[in-house]
Amino acid sequence: ISHDRLEQRVAASEQSLRSSLLLLRNRARQLSEKGELLTPMAESILAVLAQYGSFNAAALYPVDSEGRLKGKPLAVMGEMSSLDSNDLLVQMCLEKGDVVSVRETIIEQGKDASLSSLQACVPLIDAEDRLLAVVAIKSMPFFAFNDRTFSLLALLGGHVADLLQSDPKALQLASLDAQHFSQHLKRARLDAENHDLPGSLMFVELSLENEPLLKALQDSQRGLDLQIQLRNGRSYAGVMILMPLTDAEGVLGYEKRLQYLLTERFGQGVSLDSLEVRVHHHQLDPKGRSTGLHDFLYIECGLNDQQMAI
């Protein structure tokens, strides 16, 4: 099941997936300056997962760097007895890095259900495949015991793990889109610094309001690129484009593609110049220095640190 389809299914519930994650993100913003987020957010995380999984007895356990349960639970709801670290479902969840249930254990694998005191386990695994915690579920109603619920819990677990690993500066940004963009920019900078991979930024600044042009820019987006619409300190609308794995030659190729699209949409002779558009470029520094990027974003493009964190 795709993430989009899952979000559509959840949208009919009292709180959509996005609004639930927004609540967690706001909590994370409040705590981000104080260090790690898992411990102080554990109860909130368990409550959100319980809302979608309908379970009434569960606990959230941290996982160490070796992939083992670490100490006591950080949050508990309902009647939960102490958990055996050798519990079958826990071990399967840690090994697979995915949601496991007692139904799957018994029916699909022929395991002995008496080897577990649980009904299901949900891992919190981020986009970098780091396992941060496990939610051990002891009791959930029969109506919730289905693939849809488990798929949704897996999706939520991944989103929550990404949030827990968020860069503190990015968490302070005003919008989810800005946070998402800044985290991808951080990753592109690390790729440049650690792996000598190219990366480019391009800011298209519109001197005049032009919705059809903004739509054309949106439609010009390539597969790996990321775009965000912003209004800078000069009160001009613009689009910041992150181009991972793209050098200066690749940027020229993108600009040719964009020019072709402009001709197609607006007619021969129309260019960014004729539309009174300024284009700003920046190549990510392979040595990881941020001075040039700082000047590009905050001086040349006229943005502020609430719109873009570095």
Give the positions of each predicted feature.
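Signal-transmission linkers at sensory-effector interfaces
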Residues: 2-33
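Signal-transducing coiled-coil linker helices
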Residues: 29-45, 175-180
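Regulatory sensory and allosteric helical modules in signal-transduction proteins
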Residues: 63, 70-72, 79-111
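Regulatory loop-to-helix N-cap segments in sensory/regulatory domains
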Residues: 110, 138-153
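A short, aliphatic-rich beta-strand micro-motif
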Residues: 117-126
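Short beta-strand-to-loop transition segments that serve as allosteric relay/switch motifs
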Residues: 134-143, 243-246
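Active-site-proximal structural segments of metal-dependent nucleotidyl cyclase/transferase enzymes
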Residues: 184-206
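Conserved helix-loop-beta segment at the catalytic/binding core of cyclic-nucleotide signaling proteins
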Residues: 214-250, 260-269
